[in-house]
Amino acid sequence: MKKENFKEYTKNFNLKKIHTGSIWTEGPCYLKKFNKVVWSDIPNNRMLSFNFNKVEIFRAPSNFSNGNTIDNHGNLITCEHGARRVTTTDQNGIITLIADEYNEKRLNSPNDVCVHSNGTIFFTDPPYGIINPKRVEGFPGKMMYGGCNVFKHDP
């Protein structure tokens, strides 16, 4: 990323690298209650966090987590390629299932997620985490329905 490309947008551009050593990172989000940023390191099957002092492991294994976001209550919502599900982690660390199937068929490999201001959760479900055994981003599996899909979950 060239600093010159952004000069017209910001006068005090200050980009700092906070971590190296991951293979493929996705889904950074800020956990306000804990004043930290978490993200997924998919092939290493872990989630990392940065508390503005140091980077540490947040969750390992992470079920090859990918996209993350925060719901309207400050809980972490995570797409897990490996478990083929979407979960929420409350502020006490308790993980609860949001979705793992559609029409009684397993999800493919939930990927990205966002939450509407009314609490509705939207997530994508491509097959990437199950169809390519040479790429470590989940566990090989059978697609239960075709295509790349977007789902809506009303709480």
Regions inferred by a protein language model and the residue ranges of each:
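Sequence-structural signature of mature extracellular/luminal beta-sheet repeat domains
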Residues: M1-P155
